[in-house]
């Protein structure tokens, strides 16, 4: 009995050790040069599943654990909320423009899910938030284990100006589940959201991603699909120069993804 107990205990220790070994994160300090090239401060997490064992690399690991407003990256789960709640039927559902002139030209027209995702059309998602309500939004967020799961706000949109916050590491967790259709929503809705996220596609790979910006900090999150597996990424940077800094999000992330052959060179 004692021998059996010790054998079981040893097996448990080995399994735990292996689990920790698989979860080990590599600090890629050399990626700092890509941030320096653009005079930017931020973090990026890259999870490469093209090999037998997952490879997780991060630049600025402490920041990767810090939570920030998700801004428009929240359109990824928010679209799932809206589909589940019946606030939108499908990608062909048209939302009529109210005629109010907004700062982004792409917002000043009728929208559907595809254009709203592509143009980051805030007013469409404001309609969703109003119909879903705070209590149901909180329930969805808790079910997803999304960041701090707090949709409260004193003013403005809770995913931009409110209390909702998520880290780069947590963004990766959500993206990985979405890739595998493992989020607690209908599979067909998850597949639709992934289709809406397509930014670029070639014969061998597909880039699915979403930007975000709250005025002070910018995101670019998503993944690149290869025949051998996906490469997930989540980047955020400070944007002290506001809109002048926005191009840096994709530029830095693309350079890093190219450095690990997750995207082809320009």
UniProtKB/Swiss-Prot annotation:
How does its record describe regulation of its activity? Inhibited by clavulanic acid.
Entries under InterPro entries matching the protein: Beta-lactam/transpept-like, Beta-lactam_class-D_AS, PCN-bd_Tpept
Q: Please give the catalytic activity noted in the UniProt record.
A: a beta-lactam + H2O = a substituted beta-amino acid
Recite the UniProt keywords alphabetically. Answer: Antibiotic resistance, Hydrolase, Signal
Annotated GO biological processes are:
antibiotic catabolic process; response to antibiotic
**Enzyme Commission designation:** 3.5.2.6
Modified positions (N6-carboxylysine) in chain numbering: 75
Q: Where is the active site?
A: 72
Does the entry feature the keyword Hydrolase, yes or no? yes
As for family, the record states: Belongs to the class-D beta-lactamase family.
So what does this one do?
Answer: This is an oxacillin-hydrolyzing beta-lactamase.
Q: Can you name this protein?
A: Beta-lactamase OXA-20
Species:
Pseudomonas aeruginosa
